[in-house]
Every structure is written in C-alpha cells, then in structure tokens.
Amino acid sequence: MIAEQGDLIEVCFDPTVGHEPRKRRPALVVSDGFFNNVLSSLTVVCPITSTSNGHPLHVEVAPGNAVEGCVCLEALRAIDLEDPHRGARHLGASLDEATMGRVLDGIGAIFGI
C-alpha cells in the first residue's frame, strides 16, 4: 500500500497493551510520503476514535471528511501497512488541510519542535 501524509486509512491496531487504542479502526497517516514509500517499510499513523472527550491531544475531525471522530495524537504509532494481519486499506480520501495542520502542530508540540 502506498500511503501519503493526510491519507485516511482503516487498519487493525491489535495487538496492543495497556491504554493503546485497539481493534480495527480508522487512522490518519502522519508521516511524509517519502518516508513511507522510500525510506522505511513503516508508516506513522494516529488512530481515530469515535469518542469526543475533550482530551487536549485529540484533534476533532472537521465535518465533511470521510470519517468522524478525533485524531488521537498521544497514540502516534509506526506500523507496517504491508503486514496482512493489519488488513490496511485506503478509505479513498485525505483529511482536509485545516485539520491536518492542527494535527501536525500538535505532533510538533509533543516533540517540542
């Protein structure tokens, strides 16, 4: 699967431990396409939850996108989209620019950049 930053995908997050988001769910590709497709066999994603609880590291997906919910920045994770267990598939859309900007700003804040 070729994934570009901003792509909305669905992927199985199992196995997990502790408070990590689990099960099959939508996710947002946050790593750059060059990283995903040239430099690494891994892709960095953030899971999307349907629960909106006001968590400071959850970015609400704007209306009109292919998915509803919140992008969980604190659950940033590198996964292998080619692993058959993950069952990754494109949802046929990308996240809108404004929401993607908020996501990238939040990730930058997590890492102090």
Segment roles from a protein language model:
Residues 1-113:
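Conserved functional hotspots at enzyme active or ligand-binding sites that engage polyanionic ligands
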